[in-house]
Amino acid sequence: IRDYYASRGLGDVYKRQLKDLLETIRIAKQNDKIAGIYIESGLLSSGSASLEAIRRSLIDFKESGKFVVAYADNFTQGNYFLCSVADKVFLNPQGILELTGLASQTLFYKGLMDKVGIEMQIFKVGTYKGAVEPFMLDKLSEANREQIQSYISTIWDNITEGIAESRGISVNDINHYANEGLFFADPVKTVECGFIDELKYKPEVEAY
């Protein structure tokens, strides 16, 4: 399965709808002529919900006893979360693994609108209604900060727990490595810490 998300919108031959990919994995599980799945992962641009759906489908595929092998020149945080479910995860010896956690940034327009003389007419009901805040405030309200933090934490917890279960690494260690951002500097560290099985070039993986 080559990463069709990497070139989404560019007319690439591997472009598919999510439901088609999930159906393909389901059929592959039942097809006795298919021994396993090889994931060649590029730079994912998919959302967390789609990644989770594909990942769950791959977990279901593995219940058949068939293998899943993953390779990337570079792993973004999203595609590593997906590929961590594989039996073997390979990284290019010159590659990086991005694992830096999640963050959210909000742009505020009130100052600009004040300068150009634009006055917004806003009707806001309820505490946790943050959509209009960029037009009426110059920073996050505590309520909006709370709900954004809750949303991000839920996604991050799902990522770390999934990786921990698949790779046998504790959630605490994953959070530590993410905070340190070590993997940008040294791909060997990804193997030492258990995130990557081996550093191999693409032809070596294809011959695996």
Question: How would you describe each model-predicted region?
Answer:
Residues I1-Y14:
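Single conserved hydrophobic/aromatic residue that forms the stacking wall/gate
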Residues K15, E40-S48, F67-D73, G95-T100, ...:
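Second-shell loop/turn segments in exported
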Residues D32-G36, A49, E63, F75-G78, ...:
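Extracytoplasmic
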Residues I1, T24, S57, N79, ...:
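Residues within well-ordered alpha-helices
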Residues L21, I54, T76, T106, ...:
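Generic non-transmembrane alpha-helix signal with a bias for helix starts/N-cap capping motifs
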